[in-house]
Amino acid sequence: MDLHRAAFKMENSSYLPNPLASPALMVLASTAEASRDASIPCQQPRPFGVPVSVDKDVHIPFTNGSYTFASMYHRQGGVPGTFANRDFPPSLLHLHPQFAPPNLDCTPISMLNHSGVGAFRPFASTEDRESYQSAFTPAKRLKNCHDTESPHLRFSDADGKEYDFGTQLPSSSPGSLKVDDTGKKIFAVSGLISDREASSSPEDRNDRCKKKAAALFDSQAPICPICQVLLRPSELQEHMEQELEQLAQLPSSKNSLLKDAMAPGTPKSLLLSASIKREGESPTASPHSSATDDLHHSDRYQTFLRVRANRQTRLNARIGKMKRRKQDEGQREGSCMAEDDAVDIEHENNNRFEEYGWCGQKRIRATTLLEGGFRGSGFIMCSGKENPDSDADLDVDGDDTLEYGKPQYTEADVIPCTGEEPGEAKEREALRGAVLNGGPPSTRITPEFSKWANDEMPSTSNGESSKQEAMQKTCKNSDIEKITEDSAVTTFEALKARVRELERQLSRGDRYKCLICMDSYSMPLTSIQCWHVHCEECWLRTLGAKKLCPQCNTITAPGDLRRIYL
């Protein structure tokens, strides 16, 4: 049962030696194997086994020759009981006495021996457990892992992050000695410093610590928290100096921008806005982003200054022109005012106080005491200047002789209309005689060649129109009757006139008709007032009744009629 239990515990991962699971210890073991001198006597490889007295075959692990104790845990040299030639302390070996070789001494007090931890570890008190250091976490602090020229303190936490503190401690100071002693004590207790390391020279310890630190910290390189750049341990100091230089340059750049902004001619509003912008900047902004923002702001500010200067130049040019104009006008007004003042002064000197006699006494007129006289007192004074007369001729009658020629018709040519009542006819005859001044009436149109059958105007009543239609005769019938009544000579002349009229009608084709008689134009006349065209008889009869155009009722006089030829 004991052998089975031992084999089960050896196969189970939880009962294997715990230091094998730590990569740091494996690196230390490989380093010790490589640096070990071949001249050191080695013990005979001894496989794991059981007492010889056991006769029963049991499945025991690591019975093969390749899985020897020396291959798993490096061979120990030297005389038993001494630790001068060991590559790493025996406290790192976690084996039960029954699996350990006879010459292995596990007596030193350590946290990794069989009396401290393991499958066969006895129960310990709480104080003992708390005083032990875990072998699964890297050391809290490494000693002599830096150059002797620039000593630093480097710390690493359980996650593998390294913290470099640039505190310069001289090697001869008490602080450095205290740190070295404390570090040696801590690492000696934790079992990470062998006796040979403690007794060797400082140069050897520095080399070994550099190798161990590189092996420990190569798995996770540090990153700059400002610019997020992946750094090596050897580059930390140089990068920190660069960041400090950039941080020192930021206030100088801001001061230079402020000096540029304080140049003469800068308005207060811009300075206020710049100060507000600087106050409103986020304190958590990175230096690189703030530097780029300042550069962009300076470029924008320079552009603004250039645009403002150009605008002010244009405005000043316009204002200068306006000022010159105002100065010229002011000089002119000043000269005029000076002349007026001189005239007023002379006038006031001559008539400063107007005097007049009253009852043998001289008195001063009160209005002369007022500044400006009546005008200054508020009274309206009429100027003695007379407006110049204009020599332009005013045409009231509207003489159109130059444009349309001499009048061709007069009031004597108008054909008067006969009224139905004899009283109205007498009044019209009297008015006509007054207009003609006793002159004879015109004989342009005789009743023989008139288009109208009688002298009366056409009536709109039905009864009278029927009677007139019965009595009316056309121009052709009347001509025929007159021809029959007259002699043969007159008849012959009338026929010739009729033939000529018919020929004219045939030649014209009756394309134009008068709107009054609805017949072809016998002698067309037009008015220079409205330019309407009617027959001569139609115009004269219409003007005899009223002085209006029969088509548009425009006031028309007989002198406005002109003969036209179609």
UniProtKB/Swiss-Prot annotation:
GO MF: beta-catenin binding; ubiquitin protein ligase activity; ubiquitin-protein transferase activity; zinc ion binding
Catalytic activity: S-ubiquitinyl-[E2 ubiquitin-conjugating enzyme]-L-cysteine + [acceptor protein]-L-lysine = [E2 ubiquitin-conjugating enzyme]-L-cysteine + N(6)-ubiquitinyl-[acceptor protein]-L-lysine
ZnF (RING-type) ranges: 514-553
Modified residue annotations for Phosphoserine: S390
A family per Pfam: RNF220
An example Gene Ontology CC term for this record: nucleus
Description of post-translational modifications: Auto-ubiquitinated; leads to proteasomal degradation.
Coiled coil: 485-513
PROSITE patterns attached to this UniProt entry: ZF_RING_2 (PS50089)
Region of interest called Required for targeting to the cytoplasm, as start-end residue ranges on this chain: 514-522
Compartment(s): Cytoplasm; Nucleus
Pathway: Protein modification; protein ubiquitination
Transmembrane domains' residue ranges: none
Top-tier EC class: transferase
Enzyme Commission number(s) from the entry: 2.3.2.27
InterPro entries: E3_ubiq-ligase_RNF220-like (IPR052443), RNF220_mid (IPR031824), RNF220_RING (IPR040178), Znf_RING (IPR001841), Znf_RING/FYVE/PHD (IPR013083)
Residue(s) of cross-link: Glycyl lysine isopeptide (Lys-Gly) (interchain with G-Cter in SUMO2): K277
Protein's GO biological process: positive regulation of canonical Wnt signaling pathway; protein autoubiquitination; protein ubiquitination
Keyword rRNA processing carried by entry: no
Quaternary structure (record): Interacts with SIN3B. Interacts with CTNNB1 (via Armadillo repeats 2-8). Interacts with USP7 (via MATH domain).
Known function: E3 ubiquitin-protein ligase that promotes the ubiquitination and proteasomal degradation of SIN3B. Independently of its E3 ligase activity, acts as a CTNNB1 stabilizer through USP7-mediated deubiquitination of CTNNB1 and promotes Wnt signaling. Plays a critical role in the regulation of nuclear lamina.
Full protein name: E3 ubiquitin-protein ligase RNF220
Organism of provenance: Macaca fascicularis
